[in-house]
């Protein structure tokens, strides 16, 4: 048995303007090549565009979008007797939020156009309404888990 203690979970810091952890999670995931100031610019422009499009609180739209995309269950590949099975596994809220942020950004990057702030704002608004690629990804994951429910005992 290991004598080491378990590492403390790091709490996500909040961003300087909105004091919101979700915004900071988005910033850290959108970050490329260490350009954090550019990541902040993209996120803040996207938030302003959400404000203009919906004329509601953009942070509530962000929260609603992430809540809509967050999966409850996912599948993990597990090897049993020479064959690999997709085993459905429930995931916690923190991991679910991380997946949701990743899926939202991936769906935003896939959208046509050049301006990332515009693409991200459009994806967030769509996700808050219950449509968009990120929502489709969540539904696809849930379908996979449902289809492989027979392998749930392999956990």
Curated annotation (Swiss-Prot):
Any one GO biological process: translation
Keywords: Plastid, Ribonucleoprotein, Ribosomal protein, RNA-binding, rRNA-binding
Subcellular location: Plastid
Predominant localisation class: plastid
GO molecular function: rRNA binding; structural constituent of ribosome
Family affiliation: Belongs to the universal ribosomal protein uS7 family.
Quaternary structure (record): Part of the 30S ribosomal subunit.
Annotated function: One of the primary rRNA binding proteins, it binds directly to 16S rRNA where it nucleates assembly of the head domain of the 30S subunit.
Protein name listed in UniProt: Small ribosomal subunit protein uS7cz/uS7cy
């Amino acid at each position: 048995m290991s004598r080491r203690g378990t590492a403390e979970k790091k709490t996500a810091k909040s961003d300087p303007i909105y004091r919101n952890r979700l915004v900071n999670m988005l910033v850290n995931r959108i970050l490329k090549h260490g350009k954090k100031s550019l990541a902040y610019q993209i996120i803040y422009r996207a938030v302003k565009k959400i404000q203009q499009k919906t004329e509601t609180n953009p942070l509530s739209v962000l929260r609603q979008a992430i809540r809509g995309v967050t999966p409850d269950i996912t599948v993990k590949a597990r090897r049993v007797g020479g064959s690999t099975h997709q085993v459905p596994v429930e995931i916690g809220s923190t991991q679910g939020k991380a997946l949701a942020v990743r899926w939202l950004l991936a769906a935003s990057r896939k959208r046509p156009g050049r301006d990332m702030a515009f693409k991200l704002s459009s994806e967030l608004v769509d996700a808050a309404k219950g449509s968009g690629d990120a929502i489709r990804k969540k539904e696809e994951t849930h379908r996979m888990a449902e289809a492989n429910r027979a392998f749930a005992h392999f956990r």
